Structure formats: structure tokens, C-alpha cells
Amino acid sequence: EAEAPSGKIDELTAAAKLLEFRSVDGGLKDTSFDTISAAAGHAALPHYKVDEYSNITIPPGSIFLCDSGGQYIGDGGAGTTDITRTVWVGSADGKAEPTAEMKDRFTRVLKGHISIARAIFPEGTTGGQLDTLARMHLWEAGCDYAHGTGHGVGSALGVHEGPQRIGKTTGSQGGTMEPLLAGMICSNEPGYYKAGEYGIRIENLILIEERQIDGADEGTWLGFENLTWVPIDRTLIDIDLLTPEERDWVDHYHACCREILGQRVADLGDDRAADWLERHTQPL
């Protein structure tokens, strides 16, 4: 946020700095996959892999997408992470703003992400049945994305681990017809990609767990518990596109981010990080 608007940071540097931050945790054994550090048009490639030949400077006044994760084994247990955030990189003079189209697409992706996160469904429901929830807001604008909405995640094992998957049942990858069961972990990662210009993806990991619903029919009902707590870039949100319930979800999510991360940041004694967290978790 402070340095990228100067045009002095490139994709490789950003990925290396992220690994440096992640390595502070002594339980880190490896990344869970090659970090997708994608600026501007590269962000429109969902599985872009930066190297010394493709590496570009992150342009001021552009979108930057970062998809990363780690494999952890330590005293606190073992686990695998996978997270994507899409952020707006401003300009040195502070005047660069995302276009109306960027904000529209980002907000529609966010609405899909929220729809999955808030879903309640009966036991036996498949990922293929839930997939439409993530896409319907993009479909209303004649848009879509050509990858799955979610994949299973292991525990210090494969970051893509079956049998479950959330996606179109017509896709080439299996798992969308597998029932979603309590205890499974999935990703929640709708996106949008405009070739040659920018890409958007918002990804959290979610745990399937039982839900108690007053007055519900007999049977077991399930929902998702969020596992990932990193602020979502408010600069790219068109608040007018959100329903009151969606605004409440974003505000609650950011309040949880502030509560969960706040003490950890305080323990580090990093005033700049504390200020960043405070600013990026304010209510909409």
C-alpha cells in the first residue's frame, strides 16, 4: 500500500516479501503451491506463474491479485492454507481510482463469495448444487469465470484434496457430485477476469459444520464456518450494489479480522501494521 504506488515493486519482489512474512512462523514447512503474484493483465490469468521472464513492475493505478498459501506443522497443530486477495494499487499522487467497471465486477464477486459463506443446506447437498450461488450475481451482468468455485483442502497435505468440490457439474474436474459433509474444508473463491486488463478473485477457506435451526424440518442441516481472516479491499467495493444483509456480513467479517488479528499485531509492536488493520476494518 505504501510502496507499490511508486512503481518500484514487481511481482517477484511482492511474492518474496510475502514468503518472508510467512516464514516468521516457525511451523512453516513450505508454501502449499507456487504463489500467484499477478499485476494488471497478468491477474486475468487465473493460474499465472511469475518467473524472471514474465515478471513485471506492479503498475500504479492497477489491480494486483495474490493467491498464496503455506504448509504448517508445529506445536499448535498442522494445517494447509490457501487465500486470495485482490487489491487496488493507487498512484503516488493519490489520485488514481478504480474504474466503475472494476468496482462493479469486484462487488459482484464479493456478493457471490458472501452467498456461499452464508449458505445453509441439507445434508446430502453437493458442491454442484451450491455453485450457482457464487455465480448468479455475475450472471446478472452477463459475466462468468472459467474455474471452480471451491476445492477440498487437506491438513498439511494437498492444497487441492478431494473428494468434494464446488463447481459446475459440466466441468472436467470431478467432485461436484460428492455430498458435502461436516468436517470437510473447502475454498470459497469466485472470480472475474477481463483478458489483458485485470483479474479479481476473493478466496477464503471454509469449514463445513452442522447448523441448529429453530423450526427446521427433520434431518441434518449444514453451513460454513469461515477460517480465513484477512481484510477485503474496501476501495474496490461498490456499496450501492450490496444489500443490507451483505453490508452487515462485510462489517462483521472485518470486525472479526480486527479482533482476531489485533492482539497478534499488538504483540509484534508494529504500529504501522496496527494502523493498517484499523483503517482496513472500518465499517462500510
PLM regions: where:
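Active-site neighborhoods and metal-handling regions in enzymes and metal-associated proteins
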Residues: E1-L284
